[in-house]
Amino acid sequence: MAAPMEVAVCTDSAAPMWSCIVWELHSGANLLTYRGGQAGPRGLALLNGEYLLAAQLGKNYISAWELQRKDQLQQKIMCPGPVTCLTASPNGLYVLAGVAESIHLWEVSTGNLLVILSRHYQDVSCLQFTGDSSHFISGGKDCLVLVWSLCSVLQADPSRIPAPRHVWSHHALPITDLHCGFGGPLARVATSSLDQTVKLWEVSSGELLLSVLFDVSIMAVTMDLAEHHMFCGGSEGSIFQVDLFTWPGQRERSFHPEQDAGKVFKGHRNQVTCLSVSTDGSVLLSGSHDETVRLWDVQSKQCIRTVALKGPVTNAAILLAPVSMLSSDFRPSLPLPHFNKHLLGAEHGDEPRHGGLTLRLGLHQQGSEPSYLDRTEQLQAVLCSTMEKSVLGGQDQLRVRVTELEDEVRNLRKINRDLFDFSTRFITRPAK
């Protein structure tokens, strides 16, 4: 069986004939071009291996193509303002877009706009999901990086503004890029900023693991899959390699190009805007405002290929080519629905839209029925009260009552455990 093909997907801000170009990583052969406007920075996303999404530069819509129908624009997803960044969940169920200082979350299966998050104070500059789609991270020009639990966002009370799980405020200037490693809720996140630092965080605890200070502002950051190396693109065109596994235990360190001359990629003549690493970690892809995309050998730091584009590069990423990209007979499993511009229920009350099923998870119910945990706590309180009154007599009746209450507590605990096990299996069941 042949190894999966790796492809480079690139966009620039001035191409008159196409919006996105796809070429084979190692041979440089041009495979596909998608037509229809220019994609903005951090504005490219692959949806479920079937659709390509591109947030149009300075426009209030997102273009969507079927991977094989490259010359036919499938849909324009309208937004209330220019889209500043875009991403799709790895499981293909959700799409996130930054519009000014707000984050819009759509459900792909129905096209419903589920929630608008407004916790940033300035424009959102970058968005990314964790590998298991359980969390997403947002960075903004307000110098903040926010970690969101998708489950908490979807279950939030509509009358309250959802709160992020973590707020990282250690950067002093706007966030330029972020990269989330593998590990789901245990992943590490690298963030870059105009304050000339790159910081490494842990999603689960929210702790700052590492801060690296450079001589220039850092415009792009990425890591290899093994997280041995962190690559940082500078505003003057250099790319710096930070070896994570060789560092001592200190949390802060400065990167000196003179001392670390063997860890610098030199070739770009303007700021580096995007970085991506191949699956095996041997090749680095970079895009720059000098209108070139370069392919580097990580070991030797030599440029092995240069591709000239028509304008400043806005996106450049290495992807494993999905089957739908290489097969002319492939068609999406489901058509892309119309994406709604307004929040679910804003125009149609609380009734679900036709053609879809609305599930409201975790919303407060109309009744006030206590949960099993509340009932258990109440029974335990009654049990303690009864035991305190045992000195008043009726020892036999008390023992019978205590036994009954203990049996009831055990029964409720079993019900609670069974309900938890069922919920876990249902939530973690793979999508068909």
From Swiss-Prot:
A GO-annotated cellular component: nuclear pre-replicative complex
InterPro entries hit by this protein: G-protein_beta_WD-40_rep, WD40/YVTN_repeat-like_dom_sf, WD40_repeat_CS, WD40_repeat_dom_sf, WD40_rpt, WDR18/Ipi3/RID3, Wdr18_C_dom
Disulfide cross-links: none
GO BP field: DNA-templated DNA replication; rRNA processing
Subcellular location: Nucleus, Nucleolus; Nucleus, Nucleoplasm; Cytoplasm; Dynein axonemal particle
Ranges for the WD repeats: 36-75, 78-116, 119-158, 170-211, 213-257, 267-306
Pfam families the record matches: WD40 (PF00400), WD40_alt (PF14077)
Keywords attached to this entry: Cytoplasm, Developmental protein, Nucleus, Repeat, WD repeat
SUPFAM superfamilies: WD40 repeat-like
Listed SMART domains: WD40
PROSITE patterns on file: WD_REPEATS_1, WD_REPEATS_2, WD_REPEATS_REGION
Function: Functions as a component of the Five Friends of Methylated CHTOP (5FMC) complex; the 5FMC complex is recruited to ZNF148 by methylated CHTOP, leading to desumoylation of ZNF148 and subsequent transactivation of ZNF148 target genes. Component of the PELP1 complex involved in the nucleolar steps of 28S rRNA maturation and the subsequent nucleoplasmic transit of the pre-60S ribosomal subunit. May play a role during development.
Family: Belongs to the WD repeat IPI3/WDR18 family.
Subunit structure: Component of the 5FMC complex, at least composed of PELP1, LAS1L, TEX10, WDR18 and SENP3; the complex interacts with methylated CHTOP and ZNF148. Interacts with NOL9. Component of the PELP1 complex, composed of at least PELP1, TEX10 and WDR18. The complex interacts with pre-60S ribosome particles.
Official protein name in the record: WD repeat-containing protein 18
Species annotation: Homo sapiens
Gene (name only): WDR18
